[in-house]
Amino acid sequence: MSTENTSLVVELLEYVKLGLSYFQALPLAQRVSIMVALPFVYTITWQLLYSLRKDRPPLVFYWIPWVGSAIPYGTKPYEFFEDCQKKYGDIFSFMLLGRIMTVYLGPKGHEFIFNAKLADVSAEAAYSHLTTPVFGKGVIYDCPNHRLMEQKKFVKGALTKEAFVRYVPLIAEEIYKYFRNSKNFKINENNSGIVDVMVSQPEMTIFTASRSLLGKEMRDKLDTDFAYLYSDLDKGFTPINFVFPNLPLEHYRKRDHAQQAISGTYMSLIKERREKNDIQNRDLIDELMKNSTYKDGTKMTDQEIANLLIGVLMGGQHTSAATSAWCLLHLAERPDVQEELYQEQMRVLNNDTKELTYDDLQNMPLLNQMIKETLRLHHPLHSLFRKVMRDVAIPNTSYVVPRDYHVLVSPGYTHLQEEFFPKPNEFNIHRWDGDAASSSAAGGDEVDYGFGAISKGVSSPYLPFGGGRHRCIGELFAYCQLGVLMSIFIRTMKWRYPTEGETVPPSDFTSMVTLPTAPAKIYWEKRHPEQKY
């Protein structure tokens, strides 16, 4: 270092010492005030300097350091996006609990984020800290992306048409069993009642999913204290877990205990089937025991298979439960649509004289359109994230998203835009007339990320199951499960709101999944009071 530079450093240190001496001489109240003000001064100064950069998306101004725009975004994300879109356009950034999130709204945003190169953005880096404590190690986001793609392929073996044909009667059996035995219905004892759909639908969802995907042994365990373990594990999916994945709190300890206990139970069943050579084509457990060897010859361990089973079951639990709840709530407001759906059921099922089959579900366009419209109005996840792994240029702009930022896409916001869906806030199942198919992917070229060919196009304004390499593989199972559930509801009962004038409750965005605000209750009546189920 030159003599000139050395003297500058010495001089700077003298100024720092002088400043510290001055600060220490101040009264305590003034020192506290300065310490409190400094982070705010730094935050505002940093934002002013940031705004001078023309290669960065505009940043939403915020006052509170670290917290940023967490409150408006966390409570009313779609209103927040709309306000920002009016000010900045489709591309902007905001501070969220220490993370800078770059948002790209609309179909072009879908294309930019869902079809981004693996080297550019990572879902694993964005979500692993949340999902790994719940699902377990070695699966989903706790493994290299190519491993996840192969895991999805393994699971898809249990999500074929042949499997759905087997699942439909199992799901139906569970629904009628719930109607008979649950205190929410007791349908053979009561002809009417009031039920909170955010109590009934999570229970019905896990019962039907576990019976079809995991087999009778696992389903039967849910009638015991084992059900509380699922509840404890479920509580690991909250916003606080996303921000703070590990804290010395009771619900974190219960989450970890539940993960070990549930995966241990799965492993015991796997071991038992293997020892008895009892591997058939019953469920997902059988499928993974037969087919869970990676391309490089590595086999999944029993622990990893157990963890993947948890991931599959829990990954779809919230979304399907919320969607079925929203279906019931919208139909409670629309007796005319209930009647339309009922008449369709009678036509297809010969006045309810034949058992429902998977092929029957494919011949119920109005039922599928109702599910499709519900998913449009209530995308289960209002935001989807990726962490930026290296600087990424946004096409046709001067913007570059730096490494370690996050990018955010919101198909749910696009679903509610007049530009793409006339009268977007109206529940209208006939907007899908002639387009009842469940598949949401845009047509065109296909690509195989390792779990089977899917549409490469993600520029559709309707993407309830995401897109790209992380597109949900459970779409057809969700339609099967929801279709059977709603078919039986429609044929078994009519329902409305308990109080005259009640309407569909607003969305609660404070959880990880978009849920109806409590109370979310319906009054149900059996269509045929004399009938036993």
UniProtKB/Swiss-Prot annotation:
Which gene produces this protein? ERG11
Which cysteines in this chain are paired by disulphide bridges? none
Identify the residues that bind heme. Answer: C472
Pfam families reported for this sequence? p450
Listed EC numbers: 1.14.14.154
Family matches, as InterPro entries: CYP450_sterol_14alpha_dmase, Cyt_P450, Cyt_P450_CS, Cyt_P450_E_grp-IV, Cyt_P450_sf
> GO terms for CC?
cortical endoplasmic reticulum; membrane; perinuclear endoplasmic reticulum
Please give the cofactor(s) recorded in the UniProt entry for this protein: heme
GO biological process terms, alphabetically, are: ergosterol biosynthetic process
Where it sits in the cell: the answer is: Membrane
Pathway, according to UniProt? Answer: Steroid biosynthesis; zymosterol biosynthesis; zymosterol from lanosterol: step 1/6
* Main subcellular location: membrane
This protein's superkingdom?
Eukaryota
Task: Give the enzyme class.
Answer: oxidoreductase
Q: What does this protein do?
A: Sterol 14alpha-demethylase that plays a critical role in the third module of ergosterol biosynthesis pathway, being ergosterol the major sterol component in fungal membranes that participates in a variety of functions. The third module or late pathway involves the ergosterol synthesis itself through consecutive reactions that mainly occur in the endoplasmic reticulum (ER) membrane. In filamentous fungi, during the initial step of this module, lanosterol (lanosta-8,24-dien-3beta-ol) can be metabolized to eburicol.
Question: Which reaction is this enzyme known to catalyze?
Answer: a 14alpha-methyl steroid + 3 reduced [NADPH--hemoprotein reductase] + 3 O2 = a Delta(14) steroid + formate + 3 oxidized [NADPH--hemoprotein reductase] + 4 H2O + 4 H(+); a 14alpha-methyl steroid + reduced [NADPH--hemoprotein reductase] + O2 = a 14alpha-hydroxymethyl steroid + oxidized [NADPH--hemoprotein reductase] + H2O + H(+); a 14alpha-hydroxymethyl steroid + reduced [NADPH--hemoprotein reductase] + O2 = a 14alpha-formyl steroid + oxidized [NADPH--hemoprotein reductase] + 2 H2O + H(+); a 14alpha-formyl steroid + reduced [NADPH--hemoprotein reductase] + O2 = a Delta(14) steroid + formate + oxidized [NADPH--hemoprotein reductase] + H2O + 2 H(+)
Name the UniProt record assigns to this protein: Lanosterol 14-alpha demethylase
